[in-house]
């Protein structure tokens, strides 16, 4: 299958899973387990004995919407606390369980009393295997990014490069991908990061515009990257969007 078909198949699989209550139940139970490590995260308790293919039973979480919190909360420290709780929970899911909430938008979060973050709707979750995980996250390491031979090996395994690429294509896609990685991974490579920094958001928009204007990045040949990265990228975009709106540090 070509890369477009692989992407379509990946999206189809996630959409089908969103209608599978048995799968969502398992995802929710696992997320509840991860939440035990995070005092500020609340995941509803699920009831397997009261659930089936058509019914999903869980506790009701009482709180205000994350959008309401973003709109009305004036204490930046409180905004930072919620942002940090979300980052810690997501990172734990990715790095410990290698299965994560892949639908990170404000509608799936509630602010509960005492500054706790309620997380709901685990219908869209994505699992990643060890091989993909190791290759993908090696790209935030300087010793990989700065080693052209090692970098090419990883890019080939992650489908950012193809064996059939011409030398010109290889250079172009390598340069573009490294530029994206260096910018987007900036928060992951920093001890602390201020998502209220407008410069980061401006840099993202500038890079997006540059890529959009680059005619060499049009067409099927420019669609690069493993299908397994699709929902991981979607999750990071959602995460960064929430953190930007919170102006979290």
Question: What are the language-model segments listed below?
Answer:
Residues 33, 101, 244-246:
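Juxtamembrane "helix exit" motif at the C-terminal ends of alpha-helical transmembrane segments
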Residues 107-111:
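Hydrophobic residue at the +6 position relative to the catalytic HRD Asp in the kinase catalytic loop
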Residues 52, 61-63, 68-85, 112-249:
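Helix-rich C-lobe and terminal helical cap/extension of kinase-like folds
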